[in-house]
Amino acid sequence: MEKALFRNLASRQVYILLAFANGQYRPIGNPFYFDGKDIHPYVADTSKCYSTELYRKYPLSERIRNYMGGIKDGHFEAACDKDFKNAELLCTVKDTPGINYNHVILEKPVRGRYARFCSSAEGYAEVAEMHFYKGEEEIVPIDSWGDAPATANTFAYQVYDNEPLSYFISSKPGASVTVDFGKVVTIDNFMYMPRNDDNFVRIGDCYELFYWGEGCWNSLGKKMAEKPFLPYDGIPSGALLYLHDSTRGEEELIFHMEDGKQVFVSDCKD
């Protein structure tokens, strides 16, 4: 068997060999991960398939994880009075969220005209989205305001503009961002979203999952996201995967599944 020697390859990368003939490149063999010493090939076994749930199309960086942690130890509350003197606690965010959409169902309905997120004494009021509901009907605010916006381009209404990349952030800790419903309403559930990179599965977007096999990318089908994750069946064991959002965005990266979790190249350990 003929061999080729490649020098100075960067470690912790995925590679595939290509042959050039008749003016075109064609893949040879399977893609593989190089850890700096050994290679680990991705071989799709279509005789052994599994089902899973996908939550992201791009790795979650430490920077974004820290942004998401900005909401930790804060709490949501509602009140009939603007000063929140008799506020009712809706929930406390006890840990850094692991996903973008965080749905809270209240033990009992709460009445109030105003709702707000309050950061901890050490944290900044930093929220991408917060939406309040009675049943499945959203209660849309008529007004909003926040304590000490951090920049001239930071507005309280951005917490209900349905744009995950926009957010409110205060310039001081122990602050809050408030929405006004215009009248006393009944809230029995709500959704909050921490500041994030919008690379989580986004409800309403159309996605397509691919696996590498037989020298090309093979589609496992298109799906419209109805929840914060995409359920997929028939995924070949050992395959290299790629999730494409055909609705929006550019950041996407190959990954494989390990112990039921997505592992992107940047997540791989030597």
What are these model-derived regions, one by one?
Residues 2-14:
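Short Pro-Gly-centered beta-turn/loop motif in secreted/extracellular proteins
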Residues 11-14, 108-119, 233-247:
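Noncatalytic modules at the cell exterior or secretory-pathway interfaces
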Residues 12-15, 19-101, 105-110, 123-189, ...:
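Disordered, acidic Ser/Thr/Pro-rich linker "stalks" and the adjacent N-terminal cap
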Residues 74-83, 205-216, 239-243:
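Short beta-strand segments and strand-loop junctions that repeat across beta-rich extracellular domains
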Residues 92, 220-222:
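Residue-level detector of high-confidence beta-strand sites
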Residues 225-228:
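Short coil/turn segments at the loop-to-beta-strand junctions that recur within blades
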